[in-house]
Each structure stands twice: as structure tokens, then as C-alpha cells.
């Protein structure tokens, strides 16, 4: 049997790609890769570009950011330089994405010169430094106020309680500290060194920014950035359009070797065919981003890296490092791709041929023109005839020609002012070349003198030639006049970086610290994400601690109490207590410090907001006067805070003060504090009760308590107030509530009076305990404890010197929430030592029980333990819940026997306005109309929940808010709503019941 052999590898290499299976496999792999790219793009952040963009502009922005963001080009409106504006938004998001987006305070990002309204509307964790350097900046602020008002009016619930975070100080003068910063086209006014100094002032280590970039700025006096349709030009000053005609050698010398110029050169950016605002910036600042490498300032060394240059926009980053920097050669290049096909041609700039200038000329055109000029050159012809030949070739190579009815551009059009001088320069160049070639030929065919000269040694020939040239300058050949100059396509910059910053930077320790901190923050964020996922529909349940229960000291054991007090007295401060080996002491001290910091930040935010309004209205830190469009400014802020107002020195207010409102403090040039009737000052809603700073100071002065915290976690209506009433002992106890309304209810239950001296002594709010003198007690009873910050509860125990706190509350109802979204809140939840449950309600009717069970099933994540899945009712009322649709607020049946609740302040305001129109008594709309949050802990016979809008409102999806709304009544509950709201948990459950 014959045998044969073959090489399988050769066969696969030569024929494998032709097989059907190979083609199918390639097609499948390509399809999978394309599908992955498409799915990744769809998962990216959605960015809506409203500006109308052409086909080329759309390609530019998609090529740059299409792979990172899910771009939606809606083509809604024409805007000045639309592509530049669209790119600016994407650049802002791109630079922000370089930094952690946790929302934690330690991940705050600064924006030097950015648009604060963009960050405000998107909820970014960003502080903007937006100084008013001129009329344009003030115009932008006014426009941003208008835009903010317009958007808030369309969706006020989304922005309820949110404040814009910005200042009007220059970047180097703002005192906000942050590790990260961005600068979107903000470096033009500061330069590289100015940005570094601003970073140093803010404690910033990494900055990422963008700016318009054209490498030809290092060579030319004017140019075009084609992708942006932008034309730039160097001018002598900001108020003169005189062209900068500094010779090339002078430009390179001043650029590379010297930073001193005889005049201030500006760069004007104009957008072609757009009669809109242009921009003028200092060339020194722009050039610094092209030439500078490093800068050492106050113990830090800052280095710039140019990351991406695309579509005329350069993205760069500046990183600051401490300590010593050993010598290192830093090198970078600037390329000029726009001149790689050109050659420099020197032409006369004046008729006396003294001044010459360099123009760029297309290499291909010059080569063909020079070729024809050399072939047609005749020394016997008049120079004019040869000049005409060259001009004819130039015209043919730079004109529009028509071939078969189609017009085509041959070469590149020449400036009409340079046309004749270019022809003359080529003529002189041709003549000089022929003369040089003639000399070479004559030297080859030399005479006896030439042979004698050639017989000399080289040193003698050089000496003799130099003597002849010095004695007879007219005999000197003209080859030193070079008409053609080879243009370099790049310029290099070499700089030696060396800085002695003192102590060496311990990178290893820094890495360990950052890793530890990141793990801690990551765990917190993971917990917060899980919590937010659950809170979309319900408030998560606080699980019982797994730690072993500590023995609870009682008033009957004085020795144990004294021991506890001695243990605390050995610790110097809350900061020291956070390191206590006793876990619960450390936890409580940490929570108290966080609560103090939170109240301090609320105070600082109030001052900052009022100062911003004061400055926007034309005020300053020296005069008691405002100069500006007060009505426009305050009308804009009024949409966010209806309590914003101005008190004039005449004693009058700009807007009527709401009835029953008394402002305790105001703000003017002297800051925030009590004001007199003869002063000009401004106020907002925080000026009615302004005790945040006092609460912070008091909390910091206390020490963490060591007593036992017991929590009774009961369902709504389980008799928490009744339990407080049954165990209350005036000799040893004090009742503390989270708010004034709860305090009044408990006072009525205990003392049948809400304002008697006895009632006000033994039943107080937590704020009242901390801010006023109060007797010490051994036990504190807390109502609605979930509305308190854990640190505030600990501060109350410490102030009262209580050894035991019995806390009543429902962990599944509305809990304490931060009023400052930028504050990094971690320790607000109550950590009890003992926990007990109560699952029987005496208030809620029978039909509410299955409704709440259904809500818990629909809203809470699967696997979540809730006491409402097994709660029972002892009420004798079997049916209480009804609902009806209404078309407007006028159809709401306002009855003094009913209690009205709303989810939003806007609906509450509408009901109050309707009550005033119906001339109902003040006590009705002051006491019988509340929000769900305000009504937590209230018990009424007849309750009506009102929803007047069908716009998106996440509160109707949250289990905690719906639970409070549905469990306030004893006899009847009516749900009156306008329209259909997607995700309305209460409406869906009532419909299914």
C-alpha cells in the first residue's frame, strides 16, 4: 500500500482561511465583538446633546466620545459654535470620570472656572470656583440663574433641598480643600503656573483639564482649527488688531530660551462665519501649556502631561508630588502636522529688500514651478520675460480650473498680496542657483590662477579666501541669502527637573494608607448602594446586633454608675474616645463627632448660601448696601427657597413675611447673626431657627455615654406613647422627642397640657435638651428615635448623665436623613444594646393590615425581614380605606374633622392656599395639613392623603413613606389623587385589595 506524507501546518497556512468553517468562525467572532461593543455603549452614561450638529461635527464628537458615552444627538436648537459647546459637556463628564464618584466628602472635585449650574442640575459632587473677572463672567452668572430657575420650575421635587455649590472667588483664594480638580478651558486665564498655585492653595494633587490646541501657534501668527471651525490670530494687545509680525527666529528665541517679550501678545479665537462672541486670551498663559514641563511651589512639584489631542482639543493632567525630586531630563515634542507638506519661502517685506518675511508654500507647487523656471531660464533674456513665465506657472498651479464641466482647485490659492513677491523670490532663487552652478563649473575648468589657488594647502586657501572677502566685500557671493527654508514638523523641549522639597515622600506608607481608607470607604459605599436599592421601595430594617449584650446598670446600683462615670472621666475628648478599647464607647464617640461635624457643615452651608446671594445682589464685606438687580436675583432664588427675603434699613421687607414666621438671624456684611430693625440684611429658610453651630459646639464639649441603649421596635400604632405614659417616673425620667409636634402630643398624653411648666420640663425635644439648662436624670425615654441621629441621641444621654435610654420607634418608618447631600454620613443609625419587637397595632383598622403586607411584598427586596409581614390588628374597625380620583385641588373636600397629609411641600402649599380661599380658620391650615414626614408619630381619626400631580415622585414608591401615610388613621382613610402616577404603591395596593 502506497503511503504519502504532508505538512498540516503548511496546508492550514495556505488554505485554512479559504474554508467555510474558518469564515463562519471569523464572522461569529466579529459579531460577538461588535455585540459587546454595542452593549457596552448602551450601558454607558446617556449624554444628551441638544445643539444642532452637522454631519462632520457629529462624526467628530462620536469618534471622540462615542465609545465611552451613549450619545443622543437630539438636534433641538441652534447654538453658537455648537460643536465646541457639545464637546465642552463631554469634556466635563470625561474629566470627572477620572476621579472617584462616590459622593463622599473626601472625593469632592473642584472645578476651576466651570459652569456651576451644570454640576447643580446633574447632582455632581463638585465645588465650582467661578470668579467674576469681567462683564462676561457676570453675564454668565445671570444666565445660569435663569437656566436654573427654568429647569427647577419644570421639576421642583427633584431639586427640593439641593443648593448650588460654588463661590465667586478666584481659584487661588478659595479655601475649599479637595484632592481632585478639573479645569475645562479655564487655564487660559491662569496659565500652567497659575493652575499649580491654585492647586497648592486647595491641597489638590491631581487636576485634569482641557484647552484648545494648535501646535502651529509656536510657528505662525494665525491659523485655523478646522474641526472647531475656529480661527485664531495673535494680536499685539487686547484692544488692538495689529498683527504680530515678529520674525521666526525671534519667536523661537522668545519661546524656547526667553520668557520676556517687549509687548503683551494676545491670541484671539474667532469662530468662522459666526458673528458671535469671540475669546481673547494671553499668549503667555497659552504658551505655558505648550512649553512648560514642571513647576516647584511651596514644597510641591507639579508636572504636566499632555494626554490626548483630538479635534483641536488637548486633554492634559497636572499632578503634584511632595518631597525631593532628583534631577531628571523631561522631554516632550510639539508636532506641526499642518506644515509637513510645506516649505518656507523668504519674500521681501519691503521694497528696499532690507526686511524679509517667511511664508509657507506648498512643496509640490514650488517643486513644479522651480522645475519649469530652471528649464526656461535664459541668461540672455530680459528678467521681465522670465518673471512672467514664473508668474504664469504660479497662476496655473494655484487657480481654479474646469475639466469636463467640473471645477477643480489646482494647488493652493496664494495670497494676492504675496503673489508677485513669491514670483520674484523664485526668480532670484533660480538666478542664484545658476550663478552657483556656473561658479562650480568655472572652478572645475579653472585658469592658472585657480590652479595656483588649488595648489595651496587648505589652511592657506581658507586664510586667503577670508582676506579677500574682508577686503573686497562686493566680490562676496550672495549664497548667504537663502530663499528656501526647510520647515521642521516638530519642536522639542528639554528641561531638567530637580527640587529639594525637604523630607522624602514615603510612597509606601501613602499606598498603605490609601488602600486602607479605600477599603473602608468601599465597604461603606457598598452598604449604601444596597441600602439605596432597598430604599427605592422601602426603608431597610435595622438588624439586631450580634454582639453579646452588656449588663445594664440601674439607678439601684450606685457603685456601678460611679464606675462608669470614672471610666469616662479618664478620657480627654471625643477624639480620644473613638480609640477606646470599649467598642460601644468608640462607636458612640464617633457618631457624636459625625453629628457635630454635620451640624457645623449645615451652618457653614447656610453662611455660604447667604453670602452667595449677598454677593450676587451686589453686596460686599464692607458696606451695608446692595447694588444690583435685586428682583431678578431674589425671584430666581425664591423658586428654590420661598423664605428668601430682604429686610431694608427702613424696616420693610421685599416680600411679605409669611404669617407666624419670625427670623431669628440674618446675613449682611457682618456675617450671620441677630440683626436690628435699622439694618439691611437678607434671610432664607435657615434663618428662622439657626442653631446648627450651637448644637455642634455643645456636642463636641460632651463625652460619649456608657449607659445602656434599649430599643423597642414596634409597628405603627402598637402603643409606644401608651408605653411611655405607663413607665414614666418624674423623679428619674425625662421624655425626649425628635420634633416639636411629637413633644406636644406626648405632653398632652402625660399632663393633659402642651405648654404647662411641668409638661415643658419633663418632655423636651432633643435640640432643647442640648441647647438649654436641664436637670440630670438616670433614665431617658425617647419617642420616634429613628428620626434622631445616633450621635445626637448619645449627646442627649451625656448631657442628662443618663445611665439608660429606652427608645421607641419603628425602624421601617421614615428614618433620619441628611439635609446635606455632600456630607459623608456613616454613623447616623441607632446602634442599640438591647432590642425588642412589638407586632400588634391598636390604631390601624383591620383592612390596613393586608394592605401594608401587600406593600411590603411588592416594595421590599426579596429576602428582607419585615415585622409587617406578620403584624396583627386589635382595632374594631374593619373597613376604612377608600380612594377617588379628582381633577384639581378645588375638588378636595376640606373638612375640619379630617387630617390632611401630602407627600410633597408643593401639594401642601396648594392645600393651604385652597383653605385660605375658603376662609377656613388659621388653626386648620396650620395644624391639620402636614406632609407625611411631618406627620410621623401622629394619630388621627380621619385622614386624607392628597396627590395633586402625576409627575414623577419617588416618595410614592418608598415603603417607609407609604407606610407612614397609611397608618396615621383610626377610623377612615381616603386617598384623593389627580391622574395616574406610575409606580404609585398605595394606589396599586388599594386597587388590588
From Swiss-Prot:
This is Replication protein 1a. Coiled coil: none annotated. GO terms for biological process: methylation; mRNA modification; RNA processing. Residues 72-290 form the Alphavirus-like MT domain. Residues 543-576 are annotated as: Disordered. InterPro entries: (+)RNA_virus_helicase_core_dom (IPR027351), 1a_necrotic_phenotyp-det_dom (IPR021002), Alphavirus-like_MT_dom (IPR002588), CMV_1a_C (IPR022184), P-loop_NTPase (IPR027417). Its EC number is 3.6.4.-, 2.1.1.-. GO terms for cellular component: host cell endoplasmic reticulum membrane; membrane. It is a peripheral membrane protein. It comes from the Viruses. Keywords: ATP-binding, Helicase, Host endoplasmic reticulum, Host membrane, Hydrolase, Membrane, Methyltransferase, Nucleotide-binding, Transferase. Involved in the virus replication. Contains a helicase domain and a methyltransferase domain. The methyltransferase domain is probably involved in viral RNA capping. Involved in the formation of ER membrane spherular invaginations in which RNA replication complexes form. ATP binds at residues 714-721. Residues 839-993 form the (+)RNA virus helicase C-terminal domain.
